[in-house]
């Protein structure tokens, strides 16, 4: 009886240690200009996991946003217009950071957003990218290296330059 209790206690301790270790290792990745972009821990609105390698070979803009951020919605609409005008030059991935408290699907419909939208449900991706506020965007080259980081609304001239420069 005592032996079974001891085994259960050891198993629980091992499980807790593994969870803590995996959470700590999640934070080890960081987003620095010139370095490889950290992995994503996001799911699309249909519940499918989305990974950076799905965008390999393409220039990609990761846009972190919140439903309660009016400027974020303005920027997403600008990104959407430019993505429609220049569909082959820059891929967009809109990463919602509201977690459980937000209804991202409802917000996308309300704001007529048709960009690829994903949820960072546990804010693991936001931590890996050292997010301070929204909107924040990262531009990755086709190999996944971070070229630029923008905190706040990106000016129209910078956005246009990003889309026009393949």
Regions found by a protein language model. Give the residues of each.
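Bacterial N-terminal signal peptides that target proteins for export
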Residues: 2-14
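Bacterial N-terminal signal peptides
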Residues: 13-22
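N-terminal "domain-start" segment that seeds a small globular fold
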Residues: 26-52
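Short active-site neighborhood of thiol/selenol oxidoreductases, capturing the structured segment around
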Residues: 52-70
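Hydrophobic beta-strand core positions in alpha/beta domains
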Residues: 63, 94, 138-139
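Structural microenvironment flanking redox-active thiols in thiol-disulfide oxidoreductases
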Residues: 73-111, 121-127
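Thiol/disulfide oxidoreductase modules built on the thioredoxin-like
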Residues: 107-113, 121-164
């Amino acid at each position: 009886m005592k032996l079974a209790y001891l085994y259960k206690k050891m198993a629980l301790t091992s499980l807790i240690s593994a969870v803590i270790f995996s959470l700590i290792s999640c934070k080890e990745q960081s987003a620095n200009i010139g370095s490889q972009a950290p992995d994503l821990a996001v799911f699309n609105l249909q519940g499918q996991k989305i990974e950076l390698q799905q965008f390999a070979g393409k220039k990609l803009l990761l846009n972190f946003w919140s439903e309660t951020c009016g400027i974020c919605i303005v920027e997403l609409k600008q990104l959407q217009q430019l993505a429609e005008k220049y569909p082959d030059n820059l891929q967009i991935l809109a990463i919602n950071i509201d977690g459980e408290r937000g209804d991202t699907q409802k917000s996308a419909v309300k704001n007529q957003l048709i960009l690829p939208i994903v949820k960072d449900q546990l804010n693991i991706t936001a931590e890996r990218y050292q997010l301070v506020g929204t909107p924040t965007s990262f531009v990755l080259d086709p190999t996944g290296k971070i070229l630029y980081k923008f905190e706040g609304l990106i000016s129209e001239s910078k956005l246009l330059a990003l889309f026009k420069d393949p």
